[in-house]
Amino acid sequence: MLRAEWVEKRKRFKNKTQMHLARQGIITEEMEYVAKREGLHPEFVRQEVARGRMIIPANINHLHLEPMCIGINSKVKVNANIGNSGLASDIPTEVEKAKVAIKYGADTIMDLSTGEAIKETREAIINVSTVPVGTVPIYEAWKIAKGNVKELTVDLILDVIEEQARQGVSYMTIHAGILREHLPLVQHRVMGIVSRGGAILAQWMAEHGKQNPLYEHFDKICEIFKKYDVSFSLGDALRPGCIEDATDDAQLAELKVLGELVEKAWKHDVQAMVEGPGHVPLHQVEFNMKIQQEWCHEAPFYVLGPLVLDVAPGYDHIGSAIGGALAGWAGAAMLCYITPKEHLGLPNVEDVKQGVIAYKIAAHAADIAKHWPGARDWDLAMSIARYNFDWNKQFELAMDPETARAYHDETLPQEGYKTAKFCSMCGPEFCSYKISQKVQEKVSPEELIENGNWVAP
C-alpha cells in the first residue's frame, strides 16, 4: 500500500476529505481498499461516503494507516480506548496496549490520555498504529488550562484541535451537542453528566453564562478538519451513566442537536459519525438505534457498549457486549469496547485484550444476524473442524488462538491429543460427535423423511 502517493496526488484539493472527493465522483484509492476489505463494489463505497452513511477515517498525515470504513452498510466495527491517566501508565505501556488491541482485531483505537505527556503519548501511538486513531481534544485543552475554566479559551481549544489534526489523528470526539439550555434537564438524573468532556463543557457554560464554544465555533472546526481529512465523532455529552437515566429528555435533546450538526458538517463535506449511549436496558437498545438513524440522517452510529445492567463491575465487558451485539444488529456501525476494569480503574494490557475479544464476539454476532455476506463462513469452518476433531484447525480459527490452545493443553497437553477423537470433557466413551458419526454410517440417505418447507429467518 502506497498511501503517501495517494495523498500526494490529491494535494491540489483544498478540501482533502473523502466525502468531498466522493461527491466529486472520484473513487479514491482508500475507497477501493475499503471495498476489497468489505467485499463491496468501489462505486457503492463512493456513494455511501458521498451520502454520509459511511465514513473512511483517514487523516492525510497518517500515511501507514490501512483504510477502513464505518457505516451501516458495512461490517460492524470495534474501537478500543487506551490512554494514560494522572495516576497511572506511561508511554511504553500505552504503546503496548495499542499493539495488543490491533493484534486482537480492534478496527480503530482512541487515545484518551489525561495524564502527563499527552502529546508525546499520542505521537507514539500513531507511529505504531495501522488503524485510525481518535482522540477527545478537550482533554488536552483542559490539561493545558490546568482545570481552570477561565483559562479554557476558544483559541486554546482550536489550537489543540489543529495540532492533533496535524499529528495524524483521524477522528475526534467533539462534544458540540450539549447546549446551555440542556443543563436543567440533568437535574433529575441519578448520575448527572458522566461524560468527562460533557462535564467540562457544562462547567464552562455554567461559569461563563455562555453557549457551548464547540457549538458556537463548529464551522471553524470544520475548516480544520477539511485540511487534514479528520472525521467528526459527535460526542454524546449527555449519555446516560446508568440504566435509570437511559433515553431521558437530556439524552434525546442532545441527540436532536447532533442530527443538526451532522448536516452542518456535511455542508462542509466533512465526514461525521455520531456517538451514542452508554447504559441502556436491553428492551430500549433497538429504539435508541432506530431513533438515531432517523434524527441523524443515517450517519454512522458509534455506541459505548451499551451496558444493559449496572451491577456487574469486573464483568462489564460481558454485560456491555450483550448490549453491543443487539446494537450492532439493530444498526450501530461501531462498538466502543468496555473492559473488565470499567468503573473500577485504568485498564491494563490484559484488560484491553479481554475488552477487544468480547467486542469482536459482539460485532461478529451482529454481522451474522444482519446476514452479512460471508459472515457465517468462519463459523462453518470452525464447525467442520470440530466435528472432524481437527484440533489444530480449531485453534487456528479461534478469535484467540493462544487461549483456545492453552485451555486444551490444561488437561491434554501432549501433541498426540491434537489428533484425538475426544477431549477431556467427554472422553472417548461419551463423545457425541464420535457416536453421531457412527450413527451416520449406519443410516441410509434414502431413509430421510420430508419435514416441511419452513425456512429459518
From Swiss-Prot:
This protein's UniProt keywords: 4Fe-4S, Iron, Iron-sulfur, Lyase, Metal-binding, S-adenosyl-L-methionine, Thiamine biosynthesis, Zinc
As cofactor, the record names: [4Fe-4S] cluster
Extract the Gene3D superfamilies matched here.
Answer: 6.10.250.620, Radical SAM ThiC family, central domain
The note describing how and how many cofactors are bound reads:
Binds 1 [4Fe-4S] cluster per subunit. The cluster is coordinated with 3 cysteines and an exchangeable S-adenosyl-L-methionine.
Question: Annotated Gene Ontology MF terms?
Answer: 4 iron, 4 sulfur cluster binding; carbon-carbon lyase activity; zinc ion binding
A GO CC term attached to the entry:
cytosol
List GO BP terms, alphabetically: thiamine biosynthetic process; thiamine diphosphate biosynthetic process
Look up keyword rRNA-binding and say if it applies. Answer: no
In which residues is Zn(2+) bound? H279, H343
Q: Which InterPro entries match?
A: ThiC (IPR037509), ThiC/Bza_core_dom (IPR038521), ThiC/BzaA/B (IPR002817)
Checking Pfam families in the record gives: ThiC_Rad_SAM
Q: Which residues bind [4Fe-4S] cluster?
A: C423, C426, C431
Report the superkingdom from the record.
Bacteria
Look up the record and name the pathway of this protein: Cofactor biosynthesis; thiamine diphosphate biosynthesis
The residues the record assigns to binding substrate are N81, M110, Y139, H175, S195, R196, G197, D236, A237, L238, R239, E275, Y302
What EC number(s) is this enzyme filed under?
4.1.99.17
**Catalytic activity of the protein:** 5-amino-1-(5-phospho-beta-D-ribosyl)imidazole + S-adenosyl-L-methionine = 4-amino-2-methyl-5-(phosphooxymethyl)pyrimidine + CO + 5'-deoxyadenosine + formate + L-methionine + 3 H(+)
Going by the record, the broad EC class of this enzyme is lyase
| Role, per record | Catalyzes the synthesis of the hydroxymethylpyrimidine phosphate (HMP-P) moiety of thiamine from aminoimidazole ribotide (AIR) in a radical S-adenosyl-L-methionine (SAM)-dependent reaction.
Q: Which family does it belong to?
A: Belongs to the ThiC family.
How is this protein named in the record? Phosphomethylpyrimidine synthase
Q: Which gene encodes it?
A: thiC
